[in-house]
Amino acid sequence: MKILWDEEAWRDLNSYLLNGDKKSYKKIISLIEDIDKNGVDKGIGKPEALKYNLSGMYSREINEKDRLVYKIDENGNLRILQCKTHYDKM
């Protein structure tokens, strides 16, 4: 599965490293590997299908306050949309 990063999500990922939060950075990598292995709605991080205006997207818990938000695009690629804050901030 090809992984595509939205610009905001890429900045989010790099901010964990810049701020010295290696634990959250490693968790994001683990979540992405798990999505590839187990699919979008199963596995670690409490996968959740989002609703309403976020329908078609999923989230997984990175830490207490941050969520990984992602979807599978029309070409079957995993698109990472956000790695910071909670999805209700989208």
Regions found by a protein language model. Give the residues of each.
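A short, surface-exposed loop/turn module that caps and links secondary-structure elements
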Residues: 33-61
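Charged catalytic carboxylate motif
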Residues: 27
